[in-house]
Amino acid sequence: MENLKKLELLEGLLDLDRFQHLEFLLYRRISGTYKNNKTHSSSILELRVDVDGRRPQRILSGDLFRRFTIDLGFWHNFNLDAAIAPASHFSPFTIVLYQRSFIVETVDISTSNEVTTLSGAIRYYDDPAVNDETIVVEIPRVRFFQPAPECSAKIYKAGILKSAYCLPKISEYFRSVHLEIDRYEGTSFPEDVDMGLDPSPDDLPAGTIDTARVFRNAGIDLTVQEDDVLNDPDSPDVGNNWSEAELHQLMEDNFDRFGNYLQWNVYGVIVPRFGDPNYNAGYYGTMFDWGGWQAGDTFLRQGFAIAEDATRARSSGSLYNNDAKRDRLVLQTFCHELGHAFNLPHAWQRSVDDNPASNSFMNYPWRYTDGGESGFWEDFRWEFDDSELVWMRHGNRRDVIFGGNDWIGNNLSIFTGPMPEVQEGPLALQIDGNEFVRPFEPVILQVKLTNTSAQNQIALDRLQPEDQLLQIYIEQPDGSHRRYMPPVKRLLAPGDVVNLAPGESIYDSVNLTYSTAGPTFSEPGEYRIRAYYGNEEAAVMSGSLRLRVSSHYSLEEEKLTHFLRRVDVAKFLYYRGGGPKYDGVVQELEEICGKYEKNQPEIVQQLQLALGVHYARDFKTVKVIGKKRLISVVKAEPKKAIKALSGALGSAKGKATTLDALTFAKASGLLLDVCEKLGDWKTAELTAEKAIRQLQDHESTKAHFNSFKKRLTQIRKKTKK
């Protein structure tokens, strides 16, 4: 009777009329996490069993740890005064260090005498050449309401027992994660969503779903902490638009569990809009965490954000025509970005099993190839697909855990070697840039996409790696290959569609100087760079660009290189600005510009550009006052912005610039904006005149050239008044 009372708690999940007489047939599932963590165990195994329950993948995986005992008793040999070093200071203590992870991809399953035996060959992620180790796991089968039993796990090498474990079951899930969410005043935490909203699959169960349930359904025990509401006491408008630099600093300052180490804690933030500095209506989500390559730096994938106003503003027929449907898109977008924090790529960007027709969170509804945006929602089951489940549940710990590696997939040599054949297609991709740089100089890539056909062609004007349509692959001087991974990843709507006439091109300028792994070109030698527009399976590829990084430079240049690779300086230059915590960096950069202006104009003008963008915009930070977290705004400094931007442009008096044409055009436009706000029409006129002279022969900046001509006419009207 006691068990039947417990069974009644499952009403709605089980047919009680059918099962109350068959309760003795119900066995507890064996999938979940098992771990030995007793103090006497020197070797610790965290074992994940995934063979039954919800969407089983028939896989075993594990993480191995080692417990070390440290005894500081040797300090007694120094006869220290007891007052300085009392005996209690010499008590031994232990530390636990992670060692490696493994996976068993083919599992043999058998059950006898109510014990299930699981066995298979082990593959270590960090050493796949090891092929002679196997594991045997035995798990007693117990009734549904009985406590979960311990399992035994034995690892064999070449058939000889190597290690044995007795593992208590610690969770029904495969990972345990804590998500902390902050939101800006006026936005909302993701709402519970009715899964039956039209359109949706006909066979979905009735009820609602939220962020925690999405990930628990995927086997991840997600705890959601809806934490702080960020207030703006200064203005009803200032906090609406957030740059990536502001988001990153918000994470560092406001994430309660922020730390420079691997952890199963992650930070999400909801703001109205993204923009740097102008609002981008098609920019819905971002994973903005900067990568770490030096001690003390932020580790990867600890923070993400969504822009609620922008997401809710999406329009597509009747798909988002009421609040409930807009809530659905917000939740899907939020879970998509959290998926990126787990290191999940887009469904169509995987190096293995890529699938643009996946009805997973990691697809874009508007990129769904099996029925378009409406078809996506008709098929969407609020699930990750099997490849993604395997990754989150069983991927290499360092690849999945927040603060860990940035995954780049399989062998990349095919993406940087010679073109396999001449491409036939309507679009051509070209890249260009300096072929010789010194270690402290920035590496700027000019990208051009051209319609080479005789008919008009539709293309997306997304030529920045952060937007994840353009991908860059680099062959290193030692022959190894890597994919360039920008510190920021953006989730963008399918806007910016351009209709290219025959022979027409779109252009952009890409700064490759810094990646998630640090300086992209940190070693002297020859590199080869190639770009892809699309994905690895179906992409327009560019030719290969040779780049040589000089190995001959002076001590003074080496000092400059060391400074520019410092973590705080690198962050400031990538984001082109920062809050008050970067005041020291700003001062150092100003001094560097003054010192090297004549001898190193190439780098100085890039530094002046970053300083100019920094001075030109307001910057939001969060201050804790009492129990409230209030937004504080550091106002722009337009006069300093004009000075820095003028220097970056070679000054408005005719001095030469070293900036590429596109970067020059964008910087000139920003300088004009600042001058107009300040009412400095004389500098504005000189800037527009120089921009017209500089850009008149550049096809890539034709639109900018025409814009400057119009603006110059308007400025001259102002100066005559």
Question: Model-flagged regions — what are they?
Answer:
Residues 452-516, 524-530, 600-609:
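Contiguous segments within soluble domain cores/interaction surfaces
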Residues 311-398:
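The catalytic-center signature of Zn2+-dependent metalloproteases
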Residues 552-602:
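Compositionally biased low-complexity segments at domain edges in trafficked proteins
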Residues 414-439:
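Low-complexity, acidic Ser/Thr/Pro/Gly-rich terminal tails and inter-domain linkers that flank the onset
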Residues 166-178, 537-568:
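Short beta-strand elements
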Residues 50, 68, 86-292, 310-334, ...:
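Propeptide-to-catalytic entry region of secreted or membrane-anchored zinc metalloproteases
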Residues 2-142:
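N-terminal prosegments of processed precursors
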Residues 589-606, 643-661, 694-702:
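Flexible helix-coil transition and linker loops at the boundaries of alpha-helical arrays
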